[in-house]
Amino acid sequence: SGNIIDVINSRIFPGIIEVKNSRIIKITENNEVYDNFIIPGFIDAHLHIESSMLTPAEFAQIAVKHGTVAAVCDAHEIANILGIEGIKFMVDNAENVPFKFYFSAPSGVPTTVFETNGATINATEIETLFQNLPQIKVLGEVMNYSAVINENPEILAKIIVAHKYGKLVDGHAPGLSGKDLQKYASYGISTDHECFTQKEALEKINLGMKIQIRKGSAVKNFDELIPIANEHFANCMLCSDDKHPDDLVKGHINELVKRGLKAGINLFKILQIACVNPVLHYNLDVGLLRENDFADFLIIDNLTDFNIMQTVINGNIVDENE
């Protein structure tokens, strides 16, 4: 029970949430006075777990303390060394913890033709991943955007396979604009986390792409891009991309939510991009505080500090802070 934040309908009301068999079966509004708030869980919309130097299971143990309940992970770093077996390891390891990991099929293994790599993943192997691993929701970031623009048959074959299986395609196109960007986006590339200016982000939004606003350990575009969120919140998500362990222990997506509020972003809009949009975009099995949804939510102390009191995934308390 608590003050329930209905992000989708932009309202806050006191109420009780009833959970059974991992799902919310009933939400009852009442007139009680509560000190705490209940919100949907946070989602990292683009993450390379390898940068944390942790396994998925170990990463999850820290992330849930900050209210993260799910992440969309591109395992192309381990795949560049171990190929398909590396991806399978990440997926299998992620199954060991109560956390909602989703993965992409890496499109850039090797990343460039000049790279000394340990593996190659072609379109046929991408298709095998889509067929055999339901955790894989998307074709991983298409980093070689020049290959797309120049209609390289190998990268286009991977994109075609993704569309064949109804999978989204993530992007990676820093600084790309004009006709080249239009051609890149025309292949159904749906996101980009590599924008450095608001102008660049808005051009991509106008072409139908979603912008993943990033603040990680390696690159930080959050402060530059977050002002677009009040108007374009429906087309934004939050991500860390790369998160080193010393930064992860300090905070995760929760820190970006607080930073967004301080920057003047409306409460419901910052929660929309932190909690709701990744679920809708990637079709994730993550609850959004609605009846019949999975019981994935956070109990927090207030709407300023966002201190996480409990993190709940599939109706189970996976972390609790005094």
Predicted regions and their residues:
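Divalent-metal coordination cores built from histidine and acidic residues
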Residues: 60-166
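Hydrophobic faces of well-ordered beta-strands that scaffold small-molecule active sites
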Residues: 41-49, 71-73, 101-105, 138-141, ...
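Divalent metal-binding pocket/active-site signature
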Residues: 141-199, 215-219
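N-terminal metal-binding scaffold of metallo-dependent hydrolase/deaminase domains
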Residues: 1-30
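Glycine-enriched alpha-helix->loop->beta-strand junction motifs that scaffold or abut catalytic
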Residues: 68-69, 133-136, 183-191, 205-212, ...
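His/Asp/Glu-enriched, well-ordered alpha-helical/loop segment
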Residues: 228-306, 312
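Histidine/acidic-residue-rich catalytic or RNA/ligand-binding cores of hydrolases
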Residues: 55, 84-87, 151, 178-185, ...
